[in-house]
Amino acid sequence: MINWDDPLAPISQPAEALHPAANPVLDENQGQATAAQAAPNIDVRPVNPDDKRVINGMTDINQLAPFKYPWAWEYFLNANRNHWTPLDINMAQDVHDYGHSLTLEERHVYENVLSYLTTSDILAMRNIGLAVMEKMSAPELQIYQARQVYEESLHTWTYQHCIETLGLDQGEIYNRYRVVPEINGKIQIANRRLDSVLRADIDLSNRDELHNFLMAYIFFAGIFEGCWFYNGFSPIFALQRRGLMKGTAEQFLHHA
């Protein structure tokens, strides 16, 4: 404990001051020479867009333009022009329809759709953000993929908004993919594909690894998104054609 009445003691010198040879001071010329020797041989030329690659590219990932893939930048701009949120759509009629117009079987189907889509869009978001985007070696592709991650999270918000608006049991709905065999089977297939490309030691310069990555990409784009998602949308659009759950259907139309 410090006692402020104690007499001042002499200050001891630091070890480096006692042994100057162990901590030499370089003069200005010596410092410049040492820095020049340590500096790597850096190519400071601007990026040539022809050298960019979708994956396994060696160009500077921090230089956005000039573009090699201008369509990706256009997709990014168009996606930002088409901004919306689930709160933009009136769900009042859906609350009435769910409580008074849907049969027990129709409610069951509606809930199963939400259960499958909530889990699936989280998987889609993780696939793009964790498995695909970080492997893209052209920045315009990464930027568009980043927007896609946001879109998938927006879709998940949509389903959550429907669940909250209708007052459904969130724990039961979100856990249903573990209980319903048909839903669980699809999720397990997607999980296996995703896990195979999330490994820390994946090497896309290896032909077999690259083939597996492409197969996972095709699966998520063509089957998971292209087929299974639309199978999930179709029961909601069938209800819409009968004048039911039109708010939910309008939400889903923003995804398509």
PLM region spans:
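N-terminal intrinsically disordered, low-complexity tails
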Residues: 1, 5-36
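Short, isolated positions within intrinsically disordered regulatory regions of eukaryotic proteins
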Residues: 8, 75-77, 88, 161, ...
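Generic surface-pattern signal
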Residues: 13, 63, 78-85, 164, ...
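Membrane-interacting alpha-helical segments
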Residues: 25-43, 87, 100, 104-110
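Short acidic (Asp/Glu) and glycine-rich catalytic loops that position anionic groups and cofactors
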Residues: 36, 51-55, 243-247
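Amphipathic alpha-helical packing elements
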Residues: 40-92
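Non-heme di-metal
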Residues: 93-256
